[in-house]
Amino acid sequence: MEGGVDARFYAILVTSGAEVNVATIIAERARALGLDIRSIIVPPRIKGYVILEAHDPGDVYDATRGLRHVKRRRPLILKFEEVMKLVKPEVEIPALKPGQVVEIVAGAFKGMKARVIDVNQSKGQVTVSLLEPLFRATATIPIDEVRPVEE
């Protein structure tokens, strides 16, 4: 779903550390009662919240009513964009500059050392020249597949 009007996202405040248990209980309860809970999300970077996608707030209330670890009865309504920010992993992009030596940590050239030729931040790519004595070549690879080497 891409932010359509037929369903909303509701953030439920729960006991920190009990998010997965609460999500499991909500899923079982929704299945047993025939509630229209479309998805259940346990955000990896935020403790104490479970996000439900549902059309009717009454279904959210019925799914969470009487649950031991639910702290607030009234859920927070979230926008699709806010949910995506919580769910998408943040990739830490290393600060690279031309001439710097890096190690390739993934892909076909994993484990090889290379020298940075060009960095394209907008595309998330780096062009490198491999420093292996038997395999001299240049390659353009994703920037998250390299890490700077301490010299």
UniProtKB/Swiss-Prot annotation:
In its UniProt entry, the species of origin is given as: Aeropyrum pernix (strain ATCC 700893 / DSM 11879 / JCM 9820 / NBRC 100138 / K1)
What this chain does, per the record?
Answer: Stimulates transcription elongation.
Q: How does it assemble?
A: Heterodimer composed of Spt4 and Spt5. Interacts with RNA polymerase (RNAP).
- Say which family it is in: Belongs to the archaeal Spt5 family.
Cite the entry's keywords alphabetically.
Transcription, Transcription regulation
Entry-linked Pfam families: KOW, Spt5-NGN
One of its GO biological process terms is: transcription elongation-coupled chromatin remodeling
Full protein name? Transcription elongation factor Spt5
Domain of life where this protein originates: Archaea
Q: Where is the KOW domain?
A: 98-128
Q: Which GO terms describe its molecular function?
A: translation elongation factor activity
Q: Which Gene3D superfamilies match?
A: 2.30.30.30, NusG, N-terminal domain (3.30.70.940)
